[in-house]
């Protein structure tokens, strides 16, 4: 495997970004496939070299915006839209949006520079859990869409998957809607 190191100078005096030192990361299957070279060679040639990891939290080391105190903990958001969501399009469907760790350097760096709105402060949550906030947000996005689009009869919900995201989705759905009966169908009978 080839490892490349890239140095980038960041002027923190004229920045609207927060500088963060990652302290906990989670690695997902997509990041594993990049790291292990198990993606299509054409895809790898377009996206590498790149720092992996899109699930992480960290500690603020500098914030010229004054939003955070140095030492404050934040979860980092890998979705980088050119503008905020509106009533028509979610930010991840907007033209110009890109995702860190998918053709753009992810969070496996010594210091990360992110716009303030791509960070979420947290307290009283273990770092190991905060590092999974992006993963959990995928399930919450599905639940928000369900809440907006589903008809009002919600006695039963079927989840067609049995992986880790399906588990998080079922857990969050049960927490938010304890009266709903959830059925999970997958290909692994032991689950």
Predicted regions and their residues:
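Conserved hydrophobic/aromatic beta-strand scaffold that supports enzyme active sites
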Residues: 5-9, 57-59, 73, 111-113, ...
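Active-site-adjacent beta-strand anchor residues
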Residues: 21, 53, 61, 132, ...
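Cytochrome P450 core scaffold surrounding the K-helix E-X-X-R motif
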Residues: 30-36, 85
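Glycine-rich Rossmann-fold phosphate-binding loop(s) that bind the pyrophosphate
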Residues: 135, 161-164
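Adenosine-nucleotide cofactor-binding segment
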Residues: 154-156, 160-162, 174-191
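Residues forming the Rossmann-fold NAD(P)(H) cofactor-binding site
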Residues: 167-168
